[in-house]
From Swiss-Prot:
<protein>
    <recommendedName>
        <fullName>Small ribosomal subunit protein eS28</fullName>
    </recommendedName>
</protein>
<dbReference type="GO" id="GO:0098556">
    <property type="term" value="C:cytoplasmic side of rough endoplasmic reticulum membrane"/>
</dbReference>
<dbReference type="Pfam" id="PF01200">
    <property type="entry name" value="Ribosomal_S28e"/>
</dbReference>
<dbReference type="InterPro" id="IPR000289">
    <property type="entry name" value="Ribosomal_eS28"/>
</dbReference>
<keyword id="KW-0689">Ribosomal protein</keyword>
<dbReference type="GO" id="GO:0003735">
    <property type="term" value="F:structural constituent of ribosome"/>
</dbReference>
<keyword id="KW-0963">Cytoplasm</keyword>
<dbReference type="InterPro" id="IPR012340">
    <property type="entry name" value="NA-bd_OB-fold"/>
</dbReference>
<comment type="subunit">
    <text>Component of the 40S small ribosomal subunit.</text>
</comment>
<keyword id="KW-0687">Ribonucleoprotein</keyword>
<dbReference type="GO" id="GO:0030490">
    <property type="term" value="P:maturation of SSU-rRNA"/>
</dbReference>
<dbReference type="GO" id="GO:0022627">
    <property type="term" value="C:cytosolic small ribosomal subunit"/>
</dbReference>
<comment type="similarity">
    <text>Belongs to the eukaryotic ribosomal protein eS28 family.</text>
</comment>
<dbReference type="InterPro" id="IPR028626">
    <property type="entry name" value="Ribosomal_eS28_CS"/>
</dbReference>
<dbReference type="GO" id="GO:0000028">
    <property type="term" value="P:ribosomal small subunit assembly"/>
</dbReference>
<keyword id="KW-0256">Endoplasmic reticulum</keyword>
<dbReference type="GO" id="GO:0002181">
    <property type="term" value="P:cytoplasmic translation"/>
</dbReference>
Length: 65
């Protein structure tokens, strides 16, 4: 349970999600790993190039339709 936090850089902002558009779906690339990319939902302001601290690095969000 003592997994370290993981840093990830926002590669692309995909769109808004949530019932009222309160979350932003982004594609992130892990820093320090071999170009692994996943999709996450982010709450709050975010843009390309931002660095996020992920508490869970294995969870991936479902794609927007």
């Amino acid at each position: 349970m003592d997994k370290p936090n993981v840093l990830a850089r926002v590669v692309k902002v995909l769109g808004r999600t949530g019932s009222q558009g309160q979350c932003t779906q982004v594609k992130v690339e892990f820093i320090g790993e071999t170009s692994r990319q996943i999709i996450r939902n982010v709450k709050g302001p975010v843009r390309d190039g931002d660095i996020l601290t992920l508490l869970e690095s294995e969870r991936e969000a479902r794609r927007l339709r």
